[in-house]
């Protein structure tokens, strides 16, 4: 077995396709499903999308769509560092499209040819990368757990086989209804990217460290989230079908309040007696700070159900008592409990529950 492994490694490193095929034939490797040994020739697959750029076919140039968003950060490292007067360690983050020419696009959104990435490249002094890699591992796990979908639903999966650019790598996996799948990767990329950009461009991409008096190519710790996977994680965790007393049921999207697209629904109990006008004034008070909807159609019960289904944390009902004492009924999405509050306290209530401050305080940063 060791001899075969050595042959395989040598053939892979030498890009010896004929040698790889000979190993398959010598070992009489069979397909585990069909049992056939009728293999095709060993071929190279290009996992980057190529296209043509140019106004005419004759003058067109071949270009490639980016397989990751990270390289734009590396190319602009010095620009950002100098204009921002940044000192190491610091990070540059972005979100954008990436493209992979997947051999077989499947596994729902886990193998797509076009997808959205959120990435951060964190630049550190060489020799400190493992300390920062471990710190970012814990920070990123804390961020995911702060969403409130259950600490036990997350785990680390450390890589046994590392990519050519990494000296450490781990994935954060979430327990989807169909099992654990990766949602984020944390990698120590060493100086591979900046070093190669410097090598092939012929331009210095180095940082002068005022503490040590040295110039060097920084090492990089990367965090990378698949936005599509993250969206699926949030939706699968939040979606709930509940059976209520009396035989009724409801669909509720238990989104973290900070992530809910609509924070508050303002509902006049009836479309008369001045209630719509008061409700609209409340909308005007809140709409500059939060995404607020106004809904006056159907019974208030049906309106509650509509807001539950899209994850709105609060429904505010304007009724006859509102006209008398300036109070409204606030209904909480998850518990369906209601409380009476003054109109002037609504902003503070929504801010306390829906602000990202509440989410980030859980990280203890």
Language-model features, listed with the residues they occupy:
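NTP/phosphate- and nucleic-acid-binding module
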Residues: 1-365
